[in-house]
Every structure is written in structure tokens, then in C-alpha cells.
Amino acid sequence: MFWQKEIETMPRKELEALQLERLKWIVDYSIRNVPFYAKRLGEAGVTAEKIKSLSDVTYIPFTTKADIRDNYPTGLFGADMKKIVRVHASSGTTGKPTIVGYTRNDLNNWADQVARIAVAVGVTDEDIFQISFGYGLFTGALGLHYGLERIGCTVIPASSGNTEKQLMLLRDMKVTGLVATPSYALYMGESAKESGYPMSDYKIRIGLFGSEGCTPEMRTQIEKVWGLFATDNYGLSEIMGPGVSGECIKRCGLHIAEDLSLIHIYEDLGYSRRRQDRQRVHPVHHLPVPARPRVRRAYGGGVRFL
């Protein structure tokens, strides 16, 4: 099932040509609009004209977390504030939060990106979704909210907490889809069983869970207590938010929106590798986001080849 079938089923050769075109564009745009990148890429001798293939990405210097902190709050923005219509921020648990801005076009692309991962797991315009993420600077709630609305779903912005009221809405509104963290979905399920209402009063058929890790055991528990189809998705506020990747109905791993994100896997960036050697770090370019371009951003996330 596809939301933007032409893009999502694009032949590999055409996709890589699009990635190259967008990579060159974002490099040129960043040099012209972000002083930090004008200096950093200039020192490295990188220009859009010198990028002839996707493998040339290795000539581009990494953008690190320290670079983000040093340019707080808007030093890496690539658009004037009058063009920024939304601001989100990371939690800032290790220091100052990362401020991310969105132009109107960014928000439009983001909604389609989220719509893709939702449709891929069976969401339709007949679904009624309750979003039990906390609203605010966190990208998760509003990201899923507008993506689901884009599909045509009815969206209930319940936010987090007040579990008794959450359960009442699930029952009374005959909610068919739930957005929550896996741990809160489990807690809600246990609370529902203790509430005195039969579980048959709940009509949830699908869950879009994220914002924290979900073990296979947790997924099994969630599906058992709710009788729903549990799915996982992934995103970072720095790139866009939820929608960077997500499962499909086969649940064979997370599918990346490769027309929008160029992800490369590296082994020796100086990060400590945990557990098995198959884990790597992944630098990312989010290709078409002019509000705050990220050029070869090293996120340090672990990945595993399946």
C-alpha cells in the first residue's frame, strides 16, 4: 500500500539520480544561505559542481553535535525567520536543545512523509486515531497528527496523561488507531482491563508506536492486551521528526524515505560500538529541507545489517 506510489516504487537508477540531484542542491543551497556551511565546505573545497556521484559524499565534512551546539539557536537555519512558520526542539537532556525550524513547504513534505509510513501499515481515511503523545516542542505528536490528517483520518489530539479520560475517548469515539509510546500503550491496556469495561468496547485495530524502543516481547504484550496490529517507526527532530522510516504490513524492518534522506553507513567515526560488530553509525543528509539543512550529519546511531 502506497501514499505516493510513483516515488515509493521508483526504479533504483531513477531514485539514485534524484538523490544526486537533491544532494547537489542542498550543498549549493547550504553554501549560499548558511555561513557555517559556506566556511566549512569552502575549507574542504566542496561545491555542488564537484559532486559527480553519490560516492562523492565522502568529500563532505561531517556535521557534528558540537557544531549544532556551537550554532545555537538558529545559526544553522537556511531561511529567514519570516519564512519559518513552525519551531520544534529536542529535549536538550545533554545540554541546550536543538532548535529546528520549518517552512510551510517543509511541513507539507513532512505530512506526506508521515502519510507514507501510515498507509504502508494499512491506515486508511476511515480510521479514527487518538494521539497520546505529549504535544509541545516534541515533534512526535504534531508530526503524526498532520500526517494522519493528510490521509483523511479523524484525529483526536488527546495528548499524554489522564489515562481514565484517554480510555473513555477510546471507547466512546470508537477509536481504531492509537499513537503512543509502547510503554504507555501497555499501561493503558492494563488500566483498561482493570476499568470494569469489557475489552470488546475498544475497537483499536492498529498502533503507530514510537519515541522509545520497543522489544519483540513488548510488541507481543501490546498486541495481546489490545488485539491490535503494532507497528514501529523512527525519526529525529533534527531531520524532520517521525516519518524518516517506518514498517510496512510485512514488518520486515524499517523502510527509509530515500528520496528525502540520504543515509550512509560508516564504521570508524571514533564512536564506541556496543554489542556486536555489525552495529555502525549513520550520517544523514535530509535532502530537501531549506529551513535548517543538514549536510552529512553524523548521528552516531547504531544499525545492524539483517
Residue ranges and their predicted role:
Residues T103-I117, I128-Y187:
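AMP-binding/adenylate-forming
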Residues V123-D127:
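Short helix-loop-beta connector
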Residues V114-V121, S191-S195:
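Short internal alpha-helix immediately C-terminal to a glycine-rich phosphate-binding loop
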Residues S90-S91, F129, L148, I263-I265:
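Hydrophobic alpha-helical segments that mediate membrane insertion or helix-helix packing
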Residues F2-E14, L18-I31, P35, I151-L306:
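Active-site glycine/GP-rich loop and adjacent strand/helix microenvironment
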